[in-house]
């Protein structure tokens, strides 16, 4: 979750995926060591996760990409729900292409869930349905 204060739609969509797939819902927040932590944002994220029966992990890392990749690998993650990449250079594209066995979903601004089927072109402008 990139912006903790706009995460509710992502977590709710994740709850739907977890319910359908009969898997656990885990909210992962990876923050850069370069920026100070925002306790209000973390508390808000925790509250939304709790309301949706999700476990929450907050991690601090110098290399966010590497940390997320390692987390997905170590936890044998089957489904990942994120927001829509804002640019074609987004770290999300790199993560999507790293894992053939993981099903990725994005959630648009309206809260609609979309499966990522073409990992090379999916950008914000593509998801206006």
Regions found by a protein language model. Name each.
Residues 1-4, 30-31, 61, 82-86, ...:
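Structural motif
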Residues 26-27, 56-59, 79-81, 103-106:
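Short hydrophobic alpha-helical runs that function as membrane-insertion/retention elements
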Residues 22, 53, 76, 100-103:
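Residue-level detector of structured alpha->beta connecting loops
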Residues 1-52, 57:
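Small/aliphatic-rich secondary-structure junction motif
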Residues 83-129:
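Gly/Ser-rich helix-loop-strand patches that form or flank binding pockets
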Residues 12-14, 67-71, 91-95:
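A short acidic, amphipathic alpha-helical/loop segment
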Residues 52-79, 86-88:
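Structural beta-alpha unit
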């Amino acid at each position: 979750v990139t912006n903790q204060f706009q995460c509710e739609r992502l977590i709710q969509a994740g709850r739907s995926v977890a319910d359908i797939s009969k898997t656990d819902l885990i909210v992962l927040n990876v923050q850069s060591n370069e920026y100070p932590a925002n306790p209000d944002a973390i508390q808000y994220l925790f509250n939304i996760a709790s309301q949706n029966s999700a476990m929450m992990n907050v991690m601090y890392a110098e290399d966010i990409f590497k940390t997320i990749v390692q987390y997905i690998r170590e936890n044998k993650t089957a489904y990942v729900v994120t927001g829509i990449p804002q640019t074609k250079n987004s770290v999300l594209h790199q993560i999507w292409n790293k894992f053939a066995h993981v099903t990725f979903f994005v959630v648009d601004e309206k809260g609609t869930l979309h499966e990522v089927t073409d990992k090379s072109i999916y950008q914000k402008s593509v998801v206006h349905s």
